[in-house]
């Protein structure tokens, strides 16, 4: 993927996507033992070995899939622009699906300790207050909390668009969050 496309993604505010593309490319070139891989060097066998390398490095299936999908996207752009030869079912032998993972929730005891244990410093007290607020705002992400504006609050309801997905959200403010 040319650097201009990475720049375009960043200009569009898609920093996370650009970051994932960068990581996938870096990982693949590292696996190949070079700083640049030509499209003709990307084969079904090399991709299969790369997938095995990722798994043996301790990566989870969804991470391996993400890297493979990024490489496939780069390859497809190369084919569309005429810079890469079309290879039928090039990514057929590698995993590009998405595993449904069990959400990782804190046990109740740990959550209580996080939210209510007396912090050892003022800095930790502030961090604890922010964590409690995010929890009371239905698990709002820190990025979303940081981008909230006063205009987002209307009659005990916060309305905002998720930073990552632009999905509209509405969260009722609990009485405990007003303290």
Q: What feature does the model see in each segment?
A:
Residues 1-57:
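Basic/aromatic-enriched alpha-helical hairpins
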Residues 10-11, 52-60, 128, 159-163:
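Glycine- and acidic
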Residues 51-52, 73, 131-136:
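Contiguous, well-ordered alpha-helical segments that form the cores/surfaces of helical PPI scaffolds
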Residues 17, 21, 63, 67-70, ...:
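Hydrophobic (often cysteine-bearing) scaffold residues that line and stabilize catalytic clefts
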Residues 86-142, 146:
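Basic, Lys/Arg- and aromatic-enriched nucleic-acid-binding interface segment
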Residues 56, 80, 113-120, 151:
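Conserved helix-loop functional segments at active or binding sites
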Residues 27-30, 40-42, 56-90, 138-140:
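N-terminal DNA-binding recognition helix of tyrosine site-specific recombinases/integrases
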Residues 147-179:
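Conserved tyrosine-mediated DNA breakage-rejoining catalytic core shared by Y-recombinases
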């Amino acid at each position: 993927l040319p650097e201009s496309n990475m720049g375009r993604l960043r200009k569009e505010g898609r920093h996370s996507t650009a970051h994932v593309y960068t990581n996938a490319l870096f990982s693949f070139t590292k696996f190949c033992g070079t700083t640049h891989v030509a499209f003709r060097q990307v084969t079904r066998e090399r991709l299969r070995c790369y997938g095995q390398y990722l798994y043996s490095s301790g990566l989870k299936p969804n991470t391996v899939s993400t890297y493979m999908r990024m490489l496939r996207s780069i390859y497809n752009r190369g084919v569309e622009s005429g810079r890469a030869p079309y290879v039928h079912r090039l990514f057929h032998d590698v995993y590009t699906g998405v595993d449904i993972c069990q959400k990782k929730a804190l046990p109740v005891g740990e959550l209580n300790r996080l939210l209510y244990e007396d912090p050892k410093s003022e800095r930790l007290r502030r961090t604890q207050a922010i964590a409690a607020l995010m929890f009371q705002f239905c698990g709002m992400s820190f990025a979303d909390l940081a981008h909230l504006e006063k205009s987002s609050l209307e009659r005990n309801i916060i309305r905002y668009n998720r930073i990552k997905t632009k999905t509209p959200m509405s969260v009722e403010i609990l009485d405990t969050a007003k303290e």
